[in-house]
């Protein structure tokens, strides 16, 4: 019955899902839980060497690549240029990861214009709201100028560094609230959601022109039939070290996601975890593609053997 619902969305509502490349269904290594913002290119290259040997087919480089600041928050979002300290040779770095047989995806926070970003002065008066706890404002995409700027940043990232995809975070922050300015004549959309759909459809088309197999990830809380129009990877919401939440999240996503790739939240564990505990965590991801986020260089050999066994098992089945 639920399968028919997914078909109904596509056939009757004309909500056609994005193309799902084979790479979207492969296991990925993620930097978020293992490193947070403390990342740099040589360190990640060593991790990728180990990950590739185990069968991981891609890396998702999360928050931190765009700033030297490691204090969390989103004050430096908006410019979307690699940190010259952490990633001084970004293009060569991506090429090296490609040479290992792995895809390369970068995290971007779509809505945030950070107060410490270079673009802040230009767009600080075109915000849906300012979030003090984030040290950033939410871009008002009812302005064509804002949409074009955001799209240009993401297209340039993919083009300039030969990226295979983007992890697009916080899309749910695009909404109207008490602080949202009223519509004015300089806007070409009245409704934020209409502007968002228009931008995302355009962006997906632009990215596919660069790479027909572009990978786009969104996570739970902002998933549904419409998000599948421009996203081909749907991930379980953040649930670090919660095995049951990961399994339930995978099942929930699989029920109505059709052919769209479904990924686990990034699996992690305590450094003192026994092999049996690691095995249980990995087993809970059997219903989708694995994302892993532990420092492989620091794992004991017996832990690496468990990961390798799991990877071989999932590739077989």
What are these regions (language model features)?
Residues 97, 169, 285:
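Hydrophobic, well-ordered secondary-structure elements that form the walls
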Residues 25-29, 33-155, 159, 165, ...:
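Aromatic-lined carbohydrate-binding/catalytic grooves of carbohydrate-active enzymes
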Residues 114-145, 152, 194-300:
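Glycan-recognition surfaces
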Residues 1-18:
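Beta-strand-rich recognition/accessory modules
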Residues 162-163, 212:
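Proline-aspartate-enriched helix->loop->beta-strand connector
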Residues 299-317:
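Non-catalytic C-terminal accessory modules of carbohydrate-active enzymes
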Residues 87-102, 188-211:
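Alpha-helix-loop-beta-strand connector modules within alpha/beta enzyme cores
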Residues 167-174, 216, 220-221:
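Short acidic/histidine-rich active-site segments
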């Amino acid at each position: 019955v639920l399968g028919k619902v997914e078909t109904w969305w596509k056939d009757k509502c004309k909500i056609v899902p994005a193309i799902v490349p084979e790479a979207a269904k492969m296991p990925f290594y993620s930097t978020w839980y293992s490193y947070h913002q403390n990342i740099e290119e040589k360190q990640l290259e060593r991790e990728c060497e180990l990950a590739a040997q185990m069968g991981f087919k891609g890396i998702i480089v999360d928050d931190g690549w765009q700033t030297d600041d490691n204090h969390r928050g989103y004050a430096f979002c908006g410019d979307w240029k690699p940190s010259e300290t952490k990633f001084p040779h970004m293009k060569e770095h991506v090429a090296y990861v490609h040479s290992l047989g792995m895809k390369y995806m970068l995290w971007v926070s779509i809505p945030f214009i950070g107060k410490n970003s270079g673009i802040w002065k230009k767009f600080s008066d075109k915000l849906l709201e300012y979030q003090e706890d984030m040290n950033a404002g939410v871009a008002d995409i009812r302005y064509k100028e804002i949409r074009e700027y955001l799209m240009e940043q993401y297209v340039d990232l993919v083009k300039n560094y030969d990226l295979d995809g983007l992890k697009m975070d916080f899309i749910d922050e695009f909404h109207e609230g008490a602080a949202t300015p009223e519509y004015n004549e300089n806007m070409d959309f009245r409704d934020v959601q209409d502007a968002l759909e228009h931008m995302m459809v355009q962006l997906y088309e632009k990215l596919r022109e660069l790479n027909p197999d572009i990978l786009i990830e969104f996570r739970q809380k902002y998933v549904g039939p419409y998000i599948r129009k421009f996203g081909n990877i749907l991930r379980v919401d953040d649930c670090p070290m919660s095995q049951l939440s990961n399994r339930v999240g995978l099942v929930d996503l699989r029920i109505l996601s059709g052919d769209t790739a479904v990924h686990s939240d990034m699996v992690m564990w305590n450094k003192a975890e026994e092999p049996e505990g690691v095995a249980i965590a990995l087993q809970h991801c059997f219903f989708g593609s694995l994302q892993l986020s532990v420092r492989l260089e620091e794992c004991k050999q017996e832990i690496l053997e468990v990961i390798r066994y799991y990877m071989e098992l999932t590739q077989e089945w």
